[in-house]
Structure formats: C-alpha cells, structure tokens
C-alpha cells in the first residue's frame, strides 16, 4: 500500500477516532480539582502513596465483542487491565467488575473468561456490581495496583529511541483486530514476561512507555508523544509483525502483549537484552524529536502523519 494511502487509512481507523473521542472527557477533567501530583492521560491514575504509588485503571468491553465472543471478552477485560498496571511499572493487587446481562445463563461465559484470566495472571476478583435482569449485556472491569517507581507516558525525551516490545507467538482473532498471545500460553510465562516492566521501572531503564492499545502502535505512539509534548520519526519498515497478517491490518491491531518504550540510547541494548532473554521481540522503530509531529517513513519516503500544533488526539497533553 502506498504510504499516503496507508496514512489516510490509519487516521480514519476506529482505534484512532476513538482516542479523539476522549477529548470532551480530557477537557472536563482539566476543569476539575484533581490533585496536582496525579497526571491525567497515563495508562493508570498513579496516586502517590508512601514510598510508591497506587495505580487505578478501568476498561469497558465493546458491546458487540461481549455479544459475539463473551468468554474471550471476559478474559480480555482482565488482561487489558493487568497490562495497564504492568505498563506503568506496577504489579496488580485486585480487580472488581461491573457485569450486566439479560439473564444469569448469559453471564456465565463472561464470568468464566474473567475467572480464567484472573487465575492465569494471579489477580483476585474481589467484588463489583452485577445485574442479570438487564435489557443488554455489558462488561467493565477496574483494577488496583501498586508501583515502587513509574513508567509514565509524560517523560519521553528528544533523542530517545522508541522500542516496540511484542510477543509474536500468537494468532489474530477471527473477527476483531486482536493479536492473542495469551490464552494458550503457560500462565507462568505470562506473568514472568510482564515482570519485565517493574524491572525496567525500578532500574530506571525506561524514560516513558505505554501498552499498545486499540489505536495500534501508531495510535499508541501518538498518545505517548502528546502527553510528553514531543514528536517522533517512526520507520514503518522496522515495525515487527507476523508474516501472515497484512501490514495495514497489523498497524491497527491490539496485541495481548505489546508495549511502546521511550529509552535513552545508552540503555537500549540493556532493555532489548531483557526482552531477548524472554524470547520477546523488542525492536528499535524510531526516534523521539523536539518537533511536535509524528513523521512516518518507509522506503517510499516520509509523510507528516500528525501535527500536534494543529490537532489534538486525546487532549490530555494540552491540559497536563
């Protein structure tokens, strides 16, 4: 696909459009009396607590996903919350859920999926809210965690290298752009792979980071750059991907284990070795720059994909 057409396709993808839908919320929250030491726009709300931080996050599942694949929706609701906690250098403590279904029978696969993921990641589900007399089926999950040190999305620095860490040992969902490298994986390996992120945080190996979300690697890059008030040049030809997935679809995919890290050049080798030791791909895909633009380049040339002086994404970088 031509670079200009690829850029247009990505900008019109639901993953990025949904991130822009956050703008009214970011504008509203900027007028509230949030404590000055809590940055709005990270993967979790990080609240100073003693010698560390409490981490709080929540995720809602897409209604059609809940309807069409309830077991995997239940699993994913836990998995994405766990990922948010680890992405910030923390470890999960407990989960609560809000589950609405049309009857008790329809709630069972959602509960089974959540339970399976909670066992795999060893995070207890400790309560929540349930309604099995609803006119529709819906699920959201919230999580509490704790970190000694943080990996925030607010501290990328010009000159940093952008690393994409991803587990390519998976498969694409038959209907949704989800790269599943989790449900058939040994839970011990799942947890050990995620433990890399507290290690990165506690050894100051990473300036900033985010987990790759529904916006794909490009949308996630935009979110990190917006909150850090930086830009970047990303080389599309270096982005790791499975050979069986078309590149445009891959760029819009949400991996079960995918992270974007902003790392000082002197620490890149050490960070990559940590992932390599776990057989996880960790590739240098670009550089953070001091111009507020995301520039995509390939063998075809380059294009300004996003100019933050002209257009916000979530709006959080504008209010932080």
Enumerate the language-model features and the residues they cover.
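Extreme N-terminal cap/leader segments of soluble proteins
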Residues: 1-66, 88, 97, 108, ...
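Beta-strand->loop->alpha-helix junctions that form or flank phosphate-binding loops
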Residues: 36-39, 131, 212, 230-242, ...
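Small-aliphatic-rich amphipathic alpha-helix that forms the alpha element of a beta-alpha
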Residues: 69-96, 109-120, 195-201, 217-223
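Helix N-cap motif at beta-to-alpha junctions
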Residues: 262-269
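Short, compositionally biased
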Residues: 174-189
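Glycine-rich anion-binding loops of enzyme active sites
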Residues: 53-56, 61-63, 91-176, 287, ...
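Active-site-proximal betaalpha loop/short-helix elements
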Residues: 187-256
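Acidic, Ser/Thr/Pro-rich beta/coil linker or hinge segments at domain junctions
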Residues: 2-3, 21, 278-320
């Amino acid at each position: 696909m031509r670079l200009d057409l690829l850029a247009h396709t990505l900008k019109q993808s639901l993953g990025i459009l949904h991130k822009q839908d956050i703008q009214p919320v970011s504008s509203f929250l900027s007028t509230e009396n949030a404590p000055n030491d809590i940055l709005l726009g990270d993967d979790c709300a990080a609240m100073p607590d003693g010698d560390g931080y409490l981490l709080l996050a929540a995720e809602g599942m897409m209604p059609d996903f809940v309807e069409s694949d309830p077991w995997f929706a239940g699993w994913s609701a836990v998995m994405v919350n766990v990922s948010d906690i680890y992405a910030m250098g923390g470890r999960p403590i407990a989960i609560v859920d809000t589950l609405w279904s049309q009857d008790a029978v329809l709630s069972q696969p959602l509960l089974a999926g959540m339970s399976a993921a909670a066992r795999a990641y060893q995070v207890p589900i400790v309560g929540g809210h349930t309604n099995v007399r609803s006119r529709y089926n819906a699920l959201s999950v919230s999580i509490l965690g704790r970190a000694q040190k943080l990996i925030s999305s607010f501290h990328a620095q010009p000159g940093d290298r952008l690393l994409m860490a991803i587990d390519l040992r998976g498969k694409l969902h038959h209907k949704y752009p989800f790269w599943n490298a989790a449900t058939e994986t040994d839970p011990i390996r799942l947890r050990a792979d995620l433990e890399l992120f507290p290690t990165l945080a506690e050894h100051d190996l990473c300036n900033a980071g985010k987990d790759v979300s529904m916006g794909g690697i490009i949308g996630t890059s935009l979110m990190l750059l917006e909150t850090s008030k930086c830009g970047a040049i990303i080389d599309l030809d270096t982005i790791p991907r499975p050979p069986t997935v078309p590149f445009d679809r891959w760029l819009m995919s949400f991996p079960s284990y995918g992270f974007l890290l902003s790392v000082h050049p002197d620490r890149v080798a050490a960070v990559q070795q940590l992932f390599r030791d776990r057989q996880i791909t960790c590739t240098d895909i670009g550089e953070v720059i001091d111009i507020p633009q995301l520039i995509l380049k390939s063998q075809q040339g380059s294009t300004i994909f996003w100019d933050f002086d002209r257009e916000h994404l979530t709006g959080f970088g504008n209010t932080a």
